[in-house]
Amino acid sequence: MSKKLANFAQKRWISCSSNSFNMYDPRVFREPVSNVQELRKPLDVDDERNFLFLKAMKSDATPVFYRDSVIDKLIRVCTKDGEKETSRKNVLSALEIIKRRQYKAWTKANDEEKKSIELDPFVIARKGIKNCHPLMKLQGVTRGGTTYQVPFPIEEPEAEFRAMKMMRDICRVRAKHGETHFKDILATELLAASQNEGSTITAKQELHKTCEANRAYAHYRA
């Protein structure tokens, strides 16, 4: 038995050793600093970063003025056929459209109305996506040869992804039918969703109604 186990281990199926091949030697490299305020601070004399190298910064962690984790995720969700740059251009153009529309409304409003108009498109986009978060999802469960659509609760990260996916699909369908460009539809949907309106909010409500109608199948979750 021990001989068979030794032969099995020699074939590299079992290994208790850590990977020693790493492009960033932990003795030489340190994590990069992505916070702009931290970058502006001078290093202490005894700071080890004066003598060591820094790892290459990830593309989604670069300290730029428009960096936002929710917007970055929306860009990834809207990417089609690997064209991430096109997706980024569409999403940022949608945010620019939101900014222009809100500023136009702000210039026409009186002093009292101006206080309630949000001009930051990132705040509007985050609020709109947050309002579209579904609380439940439908998942197929097979029992006795029959597949039932069973409602399941979902965690916050998945709810955010499903909200973005619903909004993306609605915008793509409307853009394909020639209503207008994707960026214009996305801007309209984000603005409407921030007010709990729009097609994505309607799709979320319909999903909740279906989950409520299928609650009799909830015992199939186990």
From Swiss-Prot:
SUPFAM superfamilies: Ribosomal protein S7. InterPro entries: Ribosomal_uS7, Ribosomal_uS7_dom, Ribosomal_uS7_dom_sf. The keyword Transit peptide applies. It holds the Pfam family Ribosomal_S7. Component of the mitochondrial ribosome small subunit (28S) which comprises a 12S rRNA and about 30 distinct proteins. Belongs to the universal ribosomal protein uS7 family. This is Small ribosomal subunit protein uS7m. It comes from Caenorhabditis briggsae.
